[in-house]
């Protein structure tokens, strides 16, 4: 099955290395229909922001769920302090980078939207709802921020202007 990669428009500075690694992950994981990428959350503001999609993984590195809400919720740690990220938890920011098997892409439009997909406005939840596996590459290199706000857009415009 061929693999197609999609970089969402809000990730204009996605490094080619991350794209290649995500496609390679899907090629190495025949049980998965999709692969995507994430990196460690580093700010409490991002953890609480609904513009930053979070992902939680199983013990094989596949997505359990995606959410705009703060997940996982370290209950006891946040009872003490909600001003900084708690230590000892893997808090992941999902990136708008996907690798798909062509066969799955053909099937995807025929799948009914999931209630959680409609609530969160996250189409990848439809794949999970319908029993598909999504492999997640956790990137450890520093990544340029995506575009979620007007300020982000201005920052990215400045990057592109500096490259001309």
PLM segments and residue spans:
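Short, high-confidence coil segments that cap the C-terminus of an alpha-helix
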Residues: 1, 29-32, 132
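Residue-level signal for threonine
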Residues: 1, 42-43, 149
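Proteins with a high burden of low-complexity, intrinsically disordered sequence enriched in S/T/G/P/A and R
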Residues: 1-2, 120
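Short aromatic/hydrophobic "clamp" motif used to bind/position activated sugar donors
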Residues: 4-6
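Short acidic donor-binding/metal-coordinating loop in glycosyltransferase active sites
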Residues: 9-11
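Short active-site-adjacent helix-start/loop capping segments
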Residues: 13-15, 145-146
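Conserved core of the sugar-phosphate nucleotidyltransferase
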Residues: 14-114
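Conserved alpha/beta core of the MobA/IspD/sugar-nucleotide pyrophosphorylase nucleotidyltransferase superfamily
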Residues: 80-164
